[in-house]
């Protein structure tokens, strides 16, 4: 089972991303919104294993220390497609605060998690919010046209955190949502 540390957004940012997910879905294009429990987010770390009992205190510290990190989504991006699918995402401006938060997650979980995915390592982290992860290459132009409705720049903030287990997707822990101050 894979464990994922996610940063969730304030209500307005969440709603803007969900609107894009719905627009993609209306055209028959898969998005994270197809999964009922999915929430718009930035992934801060992916681990093969987490000691859930001993990670509880560090996760609580993350919720306190990392509250209300500002974000500005300023562009759309594309992870190179394989022969069958591509990932289209909204990209936040990479700030010192965001990189410090990412580094802090790794520090807090270092003793409690293993098998970290290399593409979330410091120096390789590409912060993004997935808009579609299974886009056929032949539909990339169509998807980008739909995603252009995304209101860029979109300024918001990280408002809460969660620990997600995959296969099946389920939330194991989340911080209480902090009051967003925009």
Regions inferred by a protein language model and the residue ranges of each:
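Basic, often amphipathic N-terminal segments
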Residues: 1-72, 95-155, 171-182
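A basic- and aromatic-enriched beta-loop-alpha substructure that forms the phosphate/nucleotide-
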Residues: 80, 84
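Charge-rich, low-complexity N-terminal segments
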Residues: 86-88
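Short, flexible loop segments at boundaries between secondary-structure elements
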Residues: 151, 157-164
